[in-house]
Amino acid sequence: SLEATKSKKRYDLCTVARLEYRKGHHLVLESLYQIKKNYNLSLKYAILGNGPELSRLKDLVMKYNLIKQVSFIEENTPSSKIYSLSKIHIMPTVTTPQSIEGFGIANVEAAAFGLPCIVSDSGGTAESINDNGKMIKENNLIDLSNAILEVIENLSKYSKKSHQFAKRFENKKKIREYLNSF
């Protein structure tokens, strides 16, 4: 049995991000469908945010029959609440001609809550992860599904590394605040 099933967390995965194509929500949904089909594992996924992709994502939830697994959370819900109810933060961003993903501050916020992160090697999100999660090839569903299963099976190891990773940013923030006080 998977380690993660023992947890009291409501969601296995969450994404805190504007609902835009480049954030990769659609890839997570497709991956959840594949995992359910191939491993008979129904993972719960919380999506916090709003944006132009909302209706398309809801259509994908229907298409893949993930209604019982996926929750769209109102935008005014604090991200901290979703992080505290979730096990893993996932953002498999894709590069589009119009835009490229920036640093990925949500991944650092999630790490502060002990959430391992799964990101793609697209844009700046690669800098927001170290050994506190998995980096996958952009647009690679097999990579994404394998990363989800790997992190869920080794959740406590990745959670511990996430707390350690987030501490690096706390120290940098304290140093910056100190230097700015002069």
For each feature predicted by the language model, list its residue ranges.
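A structural motif in glycosyltransferase catalytic domains
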Residues: 13, 28-32, 45, 144, ...
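Active-site donor-binding acidic/aromatic loop of nucleotide-activated sugar
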Residues: 53-56, 66-76, 82
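Conserved acidic donor-binding segment of nucleotide-sugar-dependent glycosyltransferases
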Residues: 121, 131-142, 149-155
